[in-house]
A protein has these predicted regions:
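Bacterial N-terminal signal peptides that target proteins for export
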Residues: 2-12
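Extracytoplasmic/periplasmic substrate-binding proteins
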Residues: 260-322, 365-366
Length: 405
């Protein structure tokens, strides 16, 4: 599942002028003198191709961003980017598995996917990905190699997917109603006990809800390292029970004093932000460090709202773009991904009035863009690595058995 984002502000006239200037001045594509023969061949092959891009479709702002990207790709390269909106990329994984089983090794229905975590691991392990390809991308040179881009939920990426953005599990609060926000899950429970009905989290398996469970477990368990090793059930059932026991004990206590006594949960991050703004909750939860700024810009939160992470750091992952092994438009997908890694496209994506997804490029990549896009100074919170994805389904299933009904 890919990180959803809250509703963001529409493009203002000022922002439109900045973006127009940005588009005119961006230099994301090498000049003809620096284009390699191999990449020129890719550009030639891509012209006229339609790239069917399977991506989460739950945010109008992200959908609008992809429409903009399609326009740019058509005008510059003759490539059409067609978003195929899905609720969960696991659906795409199953479709690709079916094509693999049927022996459909070319002319596939999917040309590009937005993935991370368990879906990447599944696609990689089942031979569903094309590549390695990242070394072919001219804009790969701009990527900030200090970010954890070489692993995806502990699974080595090996050039089979290109990083697109950064997600961190953070909280939003209003200083006027909560002057001293909790800095740990233990402190969060204490706050909930002091203010019954004011704390909640999205219902798993919604991405943010599951992320809340993983982050809590990483703090509470006595065997953190086990979470970074593959879990094999049923033989590891005793290990699973022992490692996760502190989480269920914690949630038993939290739900007693949670919003609706833990019998009802927000649908996702957008609802937690709305409940925070309505003063029904003291904290909202998001996987986008820019979400508060975006919600403020959109008028969905007080201007005093702040974002923060717990003292131990923030659960962190990168979300990626990949190409299936049987894609019908591999060249077009390579051109589309290269464009989405350009300073221009990354700066627009990071704009909190448009999407607000933090960039994965180094700050130096933006120096030739007009202000304010020439200063992309995203500074991530101290990061906590995602557990091995094999734990995910077991945690969600156990949560469902205990609390889902």
């Amino acid at each position: 599942m890919i990180t959803p984002f809250p509703a963001l502000k529409k493009l203002t006239l000022t922002a439109a002028l900045l973006i127009s200037s940005l588009s005119a001045n961006a230099n994301e594509t090498p000049t003809n003198a620096t284009i390699t023969p191999t990449w020129q061949q890719t550009l030639t092959q891509a012209k006229g191709e339609t790239v069917y891009f399977n991506a989460w479709g739950g945010s109008q702002e992200i959908n609008d961003y992809l429409l903009w990207a399609n326009t740019q790709l058509q005008q510059r390269y003759g490539v059409t980017l067609k978003q195929v909106k899905v609720t969960d990329i696991a659906e795409t994984t199953q479709r690709l598995l079916a094509e693999k089983t049927a022996g459909k090794n070319s002319g596939g229905s999917v040309d590009m996917v937005w993935i991370n975590g368990e879906n990447f691991r599944s696609m990689k392990r089942n031979g569903l990905l094309y590549g390695p390809f990242t070394h072919q991308l001219p804009n790969w040179k701009y990527v900030d190699k200090s970010l954890p881009i070489d692993k995806d939920f502990s699974e080595p990426t090996q050039g089979l997917e290109a990083p697109w953005g950064v997600g961190q599990l953070v909280f939003i609060y209003d200083p006027e109603t909560l002057s001293n926000p909790p800095k740990s899950f233990k402190a969060l429970l204490a706050l909930a006990q002091q203010h019954p009905g004011k704390i909640s989290y999205p219902k798993p398996p919604e991405f943010h809800g599951t992320s809340f469970l993983k982050a809590a477990l990483l703090e509470l368990t006595m065997d953190k390292q086990a979470l970074y090793q593959p879990l094999q059930l049923p033989q590891d059932q005793a290990l699973f029970n022992r490692v996760t026991a502190p989480l269920w004990h914690y949630l038993d206590q939290l739900h007693k004093v949670a919003w609706h006594q833990g019998k009802q949960f927000p649908a996702g991050t957008a609802e937690t932000i709305q409940l925070l703004d309505d003063q029904q909750l003291l904290l909202a939860i998001t996987f986008n460090p820019n979400a508060a700024a975006a919600a403020i810009a959109n008028g969905n939160l007080t201007e005093k709202a702040k974002t923060y992470a717990f003292s131990a750091g923030a659960l962190t992952n990168i979300h990626f773009l990949a190409i299936p092994w049987n894609a019908n438009a591999k060249a077009g997908a390579l051109v589309a991904i290269n464009f989405l890694l350009s300073p221009e496209a990354q700066a627009r994506k990071a704009d909190t009035s448009l999407w607000g997804d933090p960039t994965i490029l180094s700050p130096q990549a933006f120096t030739k863009l007009p202000a304010p896009y020439n200063q992309q100074n995203f500074k991530p919170y101290p990061s906590i690595a995602e557990p091995n994805p094999t734990w995910l389904a077991a945690i969600e299933q156990q949560w469902q058995q205990r609390y889902g009904n």
